[in-house]
């Protein structure tokens, strides 16, 4: 198995084309290879709308004394499907933890309620903003 990650559709097309070339040009006589995509996640790329959503989340956290900084991890998440549909989304705003998807994964338990509160307040601010702009 090969885990291929890409930032956008152009990168995907290029990488898949190059892998296909490798599969076609076998170097051992009597052998063949093929590329079989077993699963795929869409990349999560920032949009102005998702940046605005993240800014609201960061403002909420900051109002409670927590500084949140964004990063692009290059990982795979369901949020990529949401973004691909054109819906603003933020990812990785759950509890504080580390060593994700490994046997030694951990979570700072007291951060779970804190991050849930941040998200609830973010949703509340979005609702207030929507109400104010629709009047």
How would you describe each model-predicted region?
Residues 1-135:
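Metal-dependent amide/peptide-bond hydrolase catalytic core
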């Amino acid at each position: 198995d090969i885990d291929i990650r890409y930032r956008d559709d152009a990168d995907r097309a290029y990488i898949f084309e190059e892998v296909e070339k490798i599969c076609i040009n076998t170097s051992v006589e009597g052998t063949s290879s093929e590329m079989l995509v077993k699963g795929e996640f869409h990349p999560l790329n920032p949009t102005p709308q998702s940046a605005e959503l993240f800014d609201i989340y960061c403002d909420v956290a900051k109002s409670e004394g927590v500084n949140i900084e964004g990063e692009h991890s290059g990982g795979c998440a369901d949020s990529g499907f949401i973004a691909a549909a054109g819906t603003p989304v933020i990812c990785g705003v759950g509890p504080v933890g580390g060593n994700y998807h490994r046997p030694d994964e951990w979570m700072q338990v007291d951060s779970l309620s804190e991050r849930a509160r941040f998200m609830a307040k973010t949703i509340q601010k979005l609702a207030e903003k929507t109400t104010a702009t629709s009047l």
